[in-house]
Design a protein with these regions (language model features):
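N- or domain-start disorder-to-order transition segments that initiate the globular core
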Residues: 1-7
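Non-heme Fe(II)/2-oxoglutarate
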Residues: 8-104
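A short glycine-rich, His/Asp/Glu-containing loop-to-beta-strand
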Residues: 17, 112-124
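Generic detector of contiguous secondary-structure segments
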Residues: 63-73, 105-106, 124-127, 141, ...
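A structural signal for short, well-ordered beta-strand segments
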Residues: 117-119, 144-146, 219-223
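Short, conserved beta-strand element in jelly-roll/cupin
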Residues: 121-124, 136-154
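Histidine-centered catalytic micro-motifs
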Residues: 128-135
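Catalytic core of Fe(II)/2-oxoglutarate
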Residues: 140, 151, 155-227
């Protein structure tokens, strides 16, 4: 549930918006616990080694664990109207069908067959460099992150960062401390902003500020698959 009209308005204005609680604390703990079970993952990425920041994340393999699959299926139709509205404003083709399964079939037919849901783990001193999760030609323009830990109790720092490159202006940044079990929806690549010619695309990157203490796990839900 949630006021999706207000959520859409905030995403339109800022490129991101807090969502309601998407998991129970028990579900969040269950997903955190999967991190040490390699059978659930297809790859582990050391961010320091790749100069992505510091910390580690793991790509889930499919079939996804139940809460992950349920969330992706529930969120896709909620985000679809925003995606289609943005495509119309930016004069881009709105490729996305009505269901996530149909969209993922399109990705797979185009050679993008690897699952992209990730579980990230940050410890004291870890951070995530500003980036965009673009893997192939087919892109769904919105994605969701969920904090699986309790800020203040489990960790300090680790704010979610969005930086928007504004046309002919300085970049604009926002920092959000994600509440436990709440989601945050944000743009994957760019968002439409009003310009003299109507609408133009403002590129947006996301990252995570340095974790000052504790441990922070997040679930990242990207709605396109990877080559």
């Amino acid at each position: 549930s949630g006021d999706w009209k207000a959520i859409a308005a905030e995403v339109n204005d800022l490129g991101g918006a807090l969502l309601p609680e998407l998991l129970t604390p028990a579900e969040a703990a269950e997903i955190r616990g999967l991190y040490e079970q390699p059978g659930y993952f297809r790859a582990a990425i050391n961010m320091g080694r790749h100069r992505f920041g510091e910390g580690e994340y793991r790509y889930f393999t499919t079939p996804y664990p139940e809460p992950v699959e349920r969330l992706k299926q529930a969120l896709y139709p909620r985000l679809l109207p925003i995606a289609r509205d943005w495509a119309a404003k930016l004069d881009r083709p709105a490729l996305w069908p009505d269901t996530l399964d149909e969209w993922l079939r399109m990705c797979h037919d185009a050679g993008q067959g690897k699952p992209t849901a990730i579980l990230l783990r940050y410890r004291a001193g870890d951070w995530n460099a500003l980036h965009r999760d673009l893997y192939g030609d087919l892109v769904f323009p919105l994605q969701v992150v969920i904090n699986l830990n309790e800020p203040g109790a489990d960790h300090r720092g680790g704010e979610f960062l969005l930086v928007e490159q504004r046309p002919r202006a300085q970049s604009r940044g926002t920092a959000t401390l994600l509440p436990h079990c709440r989601g945050y929806v944000f743009t994957t690549r760019d968002r439409p902003v009003r310009s003299a010619r109507g609408w133009s695309a403002a590129p947006v990157r996301h990252g995570v500020s340095v974790l000052r203490s504790g441990e922070r796990h997040t679930l990242g839900l990207v709605f396109h698959d990877a080559p």
